[in-house]
Structure formats: C-alpha cells, structure tokens
Amino acid sequence: MNIFAIETSCDETSASVVLNGLKVKSVVIYSQIKIHAGFFGVVPELASRSHIENINLVIWRALSDAGINFTDFSQKIDALAFTSGPGLAGALLVGAIAAKSLACVYKKPLIPVNHLDGHLYSSLIENRSVKLPFLSLIISGGHTELVVVEDFGKYKVLGSTRDDAAGEAFDKAAKMLGLSYPGGPIIDKIAESGNPEAVRFTRPYLKGSWDFSFSGIKTALLNYLKTNPVRNEKQLNDICASFRQAVAETLCFKSFEAAKKFNLKRIVLGGGVSANSLIRKIFLETGQKNNTKVFIPSLIYSTDNAAMIGCAAYFKQKKCGLKYDNIQLKPNPSLPLENWRL
C-alpha cells in the first residue's frame, strides 16, 4: 500500500511516499531555519507563508523521486495522509488543504495523523525489530512526553513537561549564551570541546512523578551567568557541555526508571532533540548496562518529516480502516496524543 503523506505542523514542509508503512520510497524536507533564525524562534505568520510558497514544489519532488507523476498518481497512490495536529494553526492548514485537494481530485481516502504518532513510530522505519509494547520518549522543541505504547494506537501517557520542553530549554540557553537559533544543534557541537563536569547544573528529577521540568536548569544557567559571564571560548565550551549533560541525564534517568517500573525492555526515542549526540550516546550506553534495547531514528527521521506521518498512517488504517468521507476534517493545533478510535 502506497501512502502519500504531507507534514507541515511547524517549520518544515515535507512530503513522502511510504510503502506499507516501513519502506520510504521518497522523502523531501524543506527547512525554514534560515527564515526564523533572525527572530530566534518560529514566527507563525512567516511559517505559513513559506509552506504556501513551497508546498507544491515539495509535493512534486517527492512524487518524482518515487517515480510517480500526476498522470499515474491514481494508479500508484492508495491513500493520502496529513498531519492534523498539534502544531501551528496556519501551517497545519496548508498541509491539510493540499492533502484534501489531492484526495478529492483522485478520489482517495484521507488519513489524519497526530504529529506525535509520527514521532512515536519514526524508529520503525529503519528498525523492523522494534516489538510492542515499548516505552517512548518524545523530545522536541514543543514536546517532552513519556509514553507507554501498549499497541498501535493504544497509549498510556506517563508524563510530560510542566514548563519548557527539552528543545525549548536548549533554544533559551543558546540565547542566554549569545548563540544563534536553533540552539540545540549549536550547543551540541560546542559542547563536544567542553568539560561536562565544569558546572554542576541542577537535575530536576521530580520525585514521585514522571513529568519533566526544565525551567530549573534554565534558571540555574541564568543565575550562573550573572556571576560568571562568558569571557573566553573554553568557558563557553564548558558551560555548553555542562548544560547538555544535565538535560541528557535528566531525560535518561526518567526514561530508564519508567522502563524498570513498567517492566519494559525496549525504549524508543523520537523528535528533533533525539538528534543530540550526547543523548543518543547516553541512552545507548545505559541500555546496554540495563539489558534494555534502545531504538533511535536516524537524523533525517528525528526531525519533522512526512515519512513518519506515512508510517503512522499505514498502521492507523490497518487498525481503524480507511475512510472516504472525512474531507471535512479540520486540523487541531492543540491535538493531544490519544488512543485511536475504530
């Protein structure tokens, strides 16, 4: 089954052709980082405009890369999928309209996909050995969620962030340090040359809860910089390394404690922050020590992409069936992670 998927929830315009949920025949991603860098964050209006300007070309390229054109689209594509939320309202609308238009023209079923579902299953694209149930940690610019995935579309959300998401924490830390946007990749690169033990930032483990909180680490950095302003490259390297270490240890500790508590031997990471080199390293090493398999998507599938939407859509239609009469579906910017309904 070939699914043509579209993802426009935030600042990446992406389209992909996915066969049977696991074989990516094409994936095209247009990033808006350069557009938003000067504002040190995503500007919703600019994001929507960029999606409008690039969606047609991205769709054409994704189809072309898969050996499909608009003439044989009807024969080679079985269903359309799009990100229905959460995300920026205007951005979501662009992808939804594009997918609905194609579904109407070619009389194909339409599959709405939760963006978080995409991150949950992104590791399955390259790791077919992932078995259910598993513990999933979604870490991105807007989300930090710990979820037990009991079956496809059957979840138990253990905890989420009480304030800043992990990605937000990195972005805000970078701004305090005078670095550019997005902060996560920049801090990750600089930290490689630093000493992670130079500064002992707080680890907010929140005993008795599976929730996360990164405002404490952010405040600790702010207070440290008030009395220890950055004066040289070595100091900057050490601060970045120490901050990265604190975030990585917090995420890892919570995840493995949850896996132990719920007797789960598989942990799956997803979301843009899972691209962080130290987070990947710590999780893999801790997994080996605890006889727990850790699955992390490759970098292209860690950040927002339409292939993960196509993957989730395939398993969703297998469980819930296909619908041809849902063209009136509207995106939901605040869509929570929820169990699939038959």
Curated annotation (Swiss-Prot):
Which cofactors go with this protein? Answer: Fe(2+)
Reactions performed catalytically:
L-threonylcarbamoyladenylate + adenosine(37) in tRNA = N(6)-L-threonylcarbamoyladenosine(37) in tRNA + AMP + H(+)
A Pfam family recorded for this sequence: TsaD
- SUPFAM superfamilies found in the cross-reference section: Actin-like ATPase domain (SSF53067)
> Which InterPro entries is this protein grouped with?
ATPase_NBD (IPR043129), Gcp-like_dom (IPR000905), KAE1/TsaD (IPR017861), Peptidase_M22_CS (IPR017860), TsaD (IPR022450)
**EC number(s) from the headed UniProt entry:** 2.3.1.234
Quick one: a GO cellular component term?
Answer: cytoplasm
Q: Which residues bind Fe cation?
A: 115, 119, 304
Q: Which cysteines are joined by disulfide bonds?
A: none
Q: Where is the protein situated, by its record's location annotation?
A: Cytoplasm
Q: Which domain of life is it from?
A: Bacteria
User: At which positions is substrate bound?
Assistant: 138-142, 171, 184, 188, 276
Q: Name one GO molecular function term.
A: N(6)-L-threonylcarbamoyladenine synthase activity
Q: Which UniProt keywords apply?
A: Acyltransferase, Cytoplasm, Iron, Metal-binding, Transferase, tRNA processing
Top-tier EC class: transferase
What PROSITE patterns has UniProt attached to this entry?
GLYCOPROTEASE
According to its UniProt entry, one GO biological process term is: tRNA threonylcarbamoyladenosine modification
Alphabetical list of CDD domains matching this protein: ASKHA_NBD_TsaD_bac
Describe its function.
Required for the formation of a threonylcarbamoyl group on adenosine at position 37 (t(6)A37) in tRNAs that read codons beginning with adenine. Is involved in the transfer of the threonylcarbamoyl moiety of threonylcarbamoyl-AMP (TC-AMP) to the N6 group of A37, together with TsaE and TsaB. TsaD likely plays a direct catalytic role in this reaction.
The name this protein carries in UniProt is tRNA N6-adenosine threonylcarbamoyltransferase
